[in-house]
């Protein structure tokens, strides 16, 4: 059953998943965003912790992409075509650190240790 579900959502094997991925990619390119930019640190504290552990340059680039996207959205414009062509919406910068944070949290829970940071959503 699990292999069936994996095949169902794998863009390399499922036409509909491939079409959805292409649609999301086009929407992100219009504003110059990456998929990892869509994660909200106020919603999930693991994401907040992962962003705190990333180098400052990466976080600054993320904030700049988000500000540019909000500016373009409010102006009802898109990025110029030459800039859209060089965007990489599915290049991940957060997933590795997020996996590490989640693995550490799971290990702490398994050992019965106190969390490093409060795990409540504001």
Curated annotation (Swiss-Prot):
Name by which UniProt lists this protein: Cytochrome b-c1 complex subunit 7-2, mitochondrial
Protein keywords: Electron transport, Membrane, Mitochondrion, Mitochondrion inner membrane, Respiratory chain, Transport
Family: Belongs to the UQCRB/QCR7 family.
Highest rank taxon of the organism: Eukaryota
Localization of this protein: Mitochondrion inner membrane
Function comment: Component of the ubiquinol-cytochrome c oxidoreductase, a multisubunit transmembrane complex that is part of the mitochondrial electron transport chain which drives oxidative phosphorylation.
Membrane topology qualifier: Peripheral membrane protein
């Amino acid at each position: 059953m699990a292999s069936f579900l994996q095949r169902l959502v794998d863009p390399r094997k499922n036409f509909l998943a491939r079409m959805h991925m292409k649609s999301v990619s086009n929407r992100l390119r219009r504003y110059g965003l990456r998929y990892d930019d869509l994660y909200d640190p106020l919603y999930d504290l693991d994401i907040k912790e992962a962003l705190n552990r990333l180098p400052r340059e990466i976080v600054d680039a993320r904030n700049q992409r988000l500000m540019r996207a909000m500016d373009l959205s409010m102006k009802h414009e898109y990025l110029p075509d030459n800039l859209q062509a060089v965007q990489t919406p599915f290049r991940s910068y957060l997933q590795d650190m997020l996996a590490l944070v989640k693995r550490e949290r799971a290990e702490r829970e398994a050992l019965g240790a106190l969390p490093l940071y409060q795990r409540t959503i504001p």
